[in-house]
Amino acid sequence: MKRIMLIGPSQCGKTSLTQCMRGEALHYQKTQAIVWSPTTIDTPGEYLENRCLYSALLASACEADIIALVLNADAPWSPFSPGFTGPMNRPVIGLVTKADLASPQRISLVESWLVQAGAQKVFFTSALENTGVDEMFIFLNAKESSCLTK
């Protein structure tokens, strides 16, 4: 499986998604620093929310195969600027988390924010209901993902 780096604001579900990907029981755990594993790089939301920490995200992106921009379906606004992932020089996917909490119109808006930020493919997930994760696994386990062939 490709190593995926999860970037998103605080409380958007990055760590829950990581726990779900590892088959662990879901429990709240505040990520205080970048957490490295063989298949994931989990980043604290503060690294996105504080521009002074962008350099840590850029440096860590070098160790990832794919960048995942994570945003909860009920997010009031996008923390990602258009073209946010350009300097990372990695394929980018978008992950809409907590998809069970929002209307289809709201999910569509969040999807458009992720695409503007650089996501080439967007997945809709719910760690609570364990939906959308299988599609993401299939994509990550593919020998050559479609967004890698641009």
Swiss-Prot record:
InterPro entries: EutP_PduV (IPR012381), P-loop_NTPase (IPR027417). GO terms for cellular component: bacterial microcompartment. Keywords: Bacterial microcompartment, GTP-binding, Nucleotide-binding. Residues 1-42 are annotated as: Targets protein to the BMC. Can be used to target proteins to the BMC (tested with GFP). GTP binds at residues 8-15. May play a role in the spatial distribution of the bacterial microcompartment (BMC) dedicated to 1,2-PD degradation, perhaps being involved in cytoskeleton dynamics; might bind GTP. This subunit is directly targeted to the BMC. Interacts with PduU, probably via the PduU beta-barrel which is predicted by modeling to be on the exterior of the BMC. This is Propanediol utilization protein PduV. It comes from Citrobacter freundii.
